């Protein structure tokens, strides 16, 4: 008790002396609390007396709506804003969900139908190609066994006729005559069969490679001397036809600036404008431009200054 009174008296005396000094100087007094009493917020807490009118510092807190200093209900109501109303969550209506599921089911059904149609079309195409190739092979197969069977029958008949035992002179003569007649008939049949095979066209060679899905891979035709000669003749005919369609022309211009320019008449259709390709530059020119290019200038009738050469030119 004595220590508390002493501290309080010491603090009171200090405060009174400071008040007196402050009053004499005319400056605002600041009372420093030296007591050991606990307060809210330390020296910045709630002070009684003249400091109660000063603005108080709010103690920091983790919650924004709670303050360290208690206040009146009116102050709290004015300071804290009213909470915003919570929006209630709601799911989509059942009708829209059903429509969405129904639309997805229709799309999946359409995709399955399209996939099934593609598979059916592919299988039908593969079966048609395999059936055509098998029928072609069946049509080509009978050509070989027929000739082979004929030759085998002739050989067998010759062997049987040569291995027959002789039974007397008369029987041997009859056997020889019959065997000779059979051999001659067999030879005739063999000749007829060979003639028929020669008259028939040769079978098409079997394709060398087949793809896994049954498609036959066509081989490029072999180049022969006949094909090369036909190619040369065809190129010659093509050149002649090209010369007939696009003849060579040349300019005929008189004057100091006139010069001879070769070109060829470009193929044109009915209703189109005539075009001439000059050999020197390869430009497509009209008759007037062609004559002007040769140095003739502007002329009224440019076709009179152009000569057609039926003979082929050196440039072709």
Swiss-Prot record:
GO terms for cellular component: nucleus. Keywords: Nucleus. Residues 99-108 have a biased composition (Basic and acidic residues). Residues 179-199, 222-235 have a biased composition (Low complexity). Residues 1-29, 72-236 are annotated as: Disordered. Pfam families: EAR (PF07897), NLS_NINJA_AFP (PF16136), TDBD (PF16135). Disulfide bonds: none annotated. It is found in: Nucleus. GO terms for biological process: negative regulation of DNA-templated transcription; signal transduction. Residues 156-166 have a biased composition (Polar residues). InterPro entries: Ninja_fam, Ninja_motif, NLS_NINJA_AFP-like, TDBD. This is Ninja-family protein 2. It comes from Triticum aestivum.
